[in-house]
Amino acid sequence: MTRGGPGGRPGLPQPPPLLLLLLLLPLLLVTAEPPKPAGVYYATAYWMPAEKTVQVKNVMDKNGDAYGFYNNSVKTTGWGILEIRAGYGSQTLSNEIIMFVAGFLEGYLTAPHMNDHYTNLYPQLITKPSIMDKVQDFMEKQDKWTRKNIKEYKTDSFWRHTGYVMAQIDGLYVGAKKRAILEGTKPMTLFQIQFLNSVGDLLDLIPSLSPTKNGSLKVFKRWDMGHCSALIKVLPGFENILFAHSSWYTYAAMLRIYKHWDFNVIDKDTSSSRLSFSSYPGFLESLDDFYILSSGLILLQTTNSVFNKTLLKQVIPETLLSWQRVRVANMMADSGKRWADIFSKYNSGTYNNQYMVLDLKKVKLNHSLDKGTLYIVEQIPTYVEYSEQTDVLRKGYWPSYNVPFHEKIYNWSGYPLLVQKLGLDYSYDLAPRAKIFRRDQGKVTDTASMKYIMRYNNYKKDPYSRGDPCNTICCREDLNSPNPSPGGCYDTKVADIYLASQYTSYAISGPTVQGGLPVFRWDRFNKTLHQGMPEVYNFDFITMKPILKLDIK
């Protein structure tokens, strides 16, 4: 496992001499070519049909089966940037092989960071070694069940698309293994890669597998269940529609990659094979969630806690995990309703969230928001509820802040009891962020003001925060004076209808410093593993935009 970095501090692994040589070779041969920026790795994967293996070269070749780059800029901007195009090469491949080589290339390009991310997150999730056996057993059964259904129902479009996603994760594993072998490091196991992809699901799976001593209500820290803030804002004359998302979780998860994928999957039931989204090393999903899809759909998500432990006992392995269902729905759906229908199948009851599916095809600027513009989808174990909520959006905004919207979901999850015991902070209408969004959303008129509200934290002066650095849009639990811990809001992504048409967004990594809040430094929390991360987070918003064109040489 790589732990490089000057002064013994966790840092990014240095590129191996061979890889560096291959990266520099084109510069030595073609002197007219401008030098590549430091830390940008190019690679192309070639499927070898006879051997059923993948060959990889450290060049960008548009005739290859998957090609792309990884810009390892985590230390300078807080983000790595990955862009991959697959299935556009000189040979015709099946959709499964296209997905496999796309996964392979991602694994090959990002393996060192995948290792770091696993190292950082494992101790956050597995606090007792005894739970790991139960998790592994559950996940092995779930994987076996999934693959059995993919084989059995080849003509079913849902299972066919599930097969594409599983081919991609298999490729990710093989590609990461290839890179590890080249560098002489220990390869990650397939289970470790599945564990990474299931981080969101594990937030509910682990409590469901843990024995509860009594019926006591466990109230989690504000960030440890992956809580987030999201906002969709429509301007008064429908001149523009803006959307944004700020992730909350442990700061141990701050190793970030923004991804642009373009996979040439030809299937009558595929609606989106090109997408841009915020993500993490080794994740084939966003987790946040923040997706811009070629179907014209935007997907945002915030997490709902399930305080009803009886519900969590309903979780079984013969289901599809949330990350898998999100990926299948993203690929297949061309409308909010269709997304909700697909996502509802084989509900695992893990990573129980509120999803906002915004259909930009239904938005007629300066004219109307047609029916179907916004669907809200919420999941708990054994039940998914969704509804068309464009009417609310027409009034100006849709906020999301970790309290369920649908009454049944709210009641079954145990929120009424929480309100009874702990007060209105847990209610849908009077949660602190509900009040702040209601008060301030009218000030959002463009991407700059959207950035401002989504990084907002004025906990010392805002009456709705009552002195608590997490009773606000962008939480800083590390500033909680009685009991600081390294968790909270650590990113923001912002876009509008115009940017989305170019798969573009503005993104910032790290805890908010708005209003003069102190910059986050790891030296205050050195016991928390943060391998591969910058020591200090003080970055600006950067523009995320895919740059690979068909005409690359």
UniProtKB/Swiss-Prot annotation:
UniProt PTM comment: The maturation cleavages that produces chains A and B are required to open the putative substrate binding pocket. Both chains A and B remain associated in the mature protein.
GO biological process, one term: phospholipid catabolic process
Propeptide span(s): 209-227
S-S pairs: C470-C475, C474-C489
GO cellular component: a single term: extracellular space
Presence of keyword Lipid metabolism: yes
EC number: 3.1.1.-
Gene Ontology molecular function, alphabetical: phospholipase activity
Positions of glycan attachment: N71, N308, N366, N411, N526
Signal peptide: 1-38
Entries under Pfam families matching the protein: Phospholip_B (PF04916)
Recorded effect of pH on activity: Optimum pH is 7.4.
Class of this enzyme: hydrolase
Intracellular or extracellular location(s): Lysosome
Function: In view of the small size of the putative binding pocket, it has been proposed that it may act as an amidase or a peptidase. Exhibits a weak phospholipase activity, acting on various phospholipids, including phosphatidylcholine, phosphatidylinositol, phosphatidylethanolamine and lysophospholipids.
Subunit organization: May form a homodimer, each monomer is composed of a chain A and a chain B.
Name of this protein: Phospholipase B-like 1
Organism: Homo sapiens
Lineage: Eukaryota, Metazoa, Chordata, Craniata, Vertebrata
